[in-house]
Amino acid sequence: MLLNFRLHPRLKEDCHLLGWLDRSYLLLSRNALFPWFILVPETEETEFHELEPIAQAELLDQINLLARFVATEYPIDKMNIGMIGNIVSQLHVHLVGRNHRDSCWPGVVWGYDGFKPYPPDEVERTVDRLIAAIPGRFRAWRAEATIRQK
C-alpha cells in the first residue's frame, strides 16, 4: 500500500466508493444507466505497460474477476473494458456492462449525456452482492476508508 496514494478528485466526484478488490480501489459510476465499475490500482504508474509484470498479472486477475461478477449479476450482452486516461491520468480501468437495449447502444458511454442516479439503497445492495460473490477479496468501504482518504 502506498501511504500517499489518493484517488484523483474527478474519480471521487464521478463515482461511489465501494471498497477494495485486493489492492485496487473499486468504484461504481454514479450513472445508473449502465453497470459501470472502475478499478484503480494503488500505484504511482499511469500506464499499464509501466507496471511490473506481477502487478500487471494482479490487475488482469482483478479485471477478470470483476468482469465475471458483472456478467453474472447484470443482464449484459457485451463487456466494455478500457484504460483511457486522457482526462484522468491516474491508472484506472473501466468495466462497463452493455446490452442491446441500453440508452446509447451501440455507441460508447464516454461523453454520453444521459444520466440516472443510483438510489442509495441500490449502491448498498451492490456492495452486499460483491461481498457475497467475491468473499475474501472484496472489502467494503467502511469507516477505515474514511480514515485512508483524509
State each model region's role.
Residues 1-91, 95-150:
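HIT superfamily nucleotide-processing domains
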